[in-house]
A protein has these predicted regions:
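Loop/turn elements at helix/coil->beta-strand transitions in domains of secreted/extracellular proteins
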Residues: 30-35, 79-85, 115
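Soluble non-cytosolic domains of exported or imported proteins
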Residues: 10-17, 54-64, 123-130, 147
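Metal-dependent active-site segment of extracytoplasmic phospho-/sulfohydrolases and closely related
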Residues: 59-103, 110, 136
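Solvent-exposed loop/turn segments at secondary-structure junctions
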Residues: 41-45, 91-94, 116-118
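Substrate-binding rim/cap in mid-to-C-terminal beta-strand-loop elements of soluble/periplasmic
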Residues: 101-143, 154
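Active-site-proximal alpha/beta segments of enzymes that process anionic O-linked groups
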Residues: 1-30, 132, 138, 152-156
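Active-site His/acidic residue clusters
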Residues: 1, 21-65, 69
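Surface-exposed acidic, glycine-flexible loop patches that form ligand/cofactor-binding
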Residues: 25-28, 75-79, 144
């Protein structure tokens, strides 16, 4: 869940619920300044049933419930007004694979919301996995190493 706290989930069948419960507890008790919650899904479904399939979209719908619970935990912890939330993925995909050179495989979804983030703005630029670290570094006020190829999309901020 965070650099100072690791949590191993008990397999795919129980993982989303167990991870969500652990995240809720951690958020409410610790009020973390930085937290990464990495669900196994929809990645597993994308690789077994295919990306852009009814099963994939059903899994996204299920995950929406877990995301809502996490958002409620942030509110309950009293840190909502100071929080920036990023939802993203580690890759795009075609059929059941990824790793190719097409934009559908390399681009990632990137949703950002929260403190000082413009509401209702669509990011027009392509977002790649390596841009995520650059965005987080920018949010935290950290200097980006020159060797990084990622870039923060500063236009999302007020």
């Amino acid at each position: 869940l965070a650099m100072s706290y690791q949590y191993q989930t008990p397999g795919y069948a129980k993982a989303p619920t167990a991870l969500c419960e652990a995240a809720e507890k951690y958020i409410i008790e610790k009020k973390p300044e930085l937290l990464a919650i990495c669900f196994e899904e929809p990645d597993h479904t994308g690789h077994t049933k295919g990306h852009d399939t009814p099963a994939y979209y059903q899994m996204l719908k299920e995950l929406d419930g877990y995301v809502e619970r996490i958002l409620q935990a942030i509110k309950k912890a009293g840190i909502w007004d100071d929080t920036i939330i990023i939802m993203t993925a580690d890759h795009g995909g075609i059929k059941t694979g990824h790793g190719g050179k097409t934009l559908r495989e390399m681009e990632i979804p990137f949703i950002i919301s929260g403190k000082n983030v413009r509401k209702g703005m669509e990011i027009k630029e392509s977002m790649m996995q390596y841009d995520t670290a650059a965005m987080i570094a920018y949010i935290l006020g950290l200097k980006q190493p020159q060797s990084w190829i990622g870039r923060p999309v500063k236009t999302v901020f007020k």
